[in-house]
Amino acid sequence: MKTILFILTFLLCENGYAQTTPSSKVFKPVELYQSNNLIVIQVSENAFVHTSYLQTNDFGNVPCNGMIVRNSNEAIVFDTPTNDSSANELIKFINEKLHCKVNAIVPTHFHSDCLGGLAAFHKQNIPSFANFSTIELTKVNNVVNPQNGFKDDLKLSLGKTFAMVNYFGQGHTKDNVVGYFPSENILFGGCLIKELDATKGYLGDANVGAWSNTVEKIKKQYPNLKIVIPGHGAIGGSELLDYTIQLFKAN
């Protein structure tokens, strides 16, 4: 089942979303790593999607996306794999195959598909950064706490460039943030952004009434995105923002 899910996701990326890098070369997504627990796909010159799996009662074995961005042998990871074992696998891949040191891990909200492997990053002395609300919610839910908090926006140095973390408002959860890689105009939307044709998914901690408005703010801030990575499913472009806005608009 995992392999089938991967192939479907990869083919959608391969056939539908070849992207243009800053050097104007067409970049087609390519699989760099696959095991039973982890997949890594390169989606641009310096951005990668990592996918791990979360067993759930309501939705089965769910593939969960995160993002890696790199520059000058440094990397930042958005969302951990779903457990410590897969997180260690990812860190090893980044160190040994991408030849990068991980500067930071950023969980984009408090659910386990974002920080289930956080302890593995801490054990390897990789600092974590999260919305203050995320830190409070991890304390309430008795899970591993991110180490460093911020309120609305955070700029993280990455080699000769940087990555941004932004809070635009409530949606999937009240604490959800997004990651943005300006040098390649890539957004990691996490669970706030849906793949095309997705259902609304888990709404147990959601603010459905605010969701569309929050995504509209993202679209206004970043109107010309080249790649958008959702928390689950296939990557795309700004049409994923449009789809998510319409999905949660009040009837």
Question: Could you say what each language-model-derived stretch is?
Answer:
Residues 35-37, 42, 74-75, 82-83, 129-243, ...:
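Metallo-beta-lactamase
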Residues 42-91, 178-191:
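Conserved beta-strand hairpin/beta-sheet module of binuclear metal-dependent hydrolase folds
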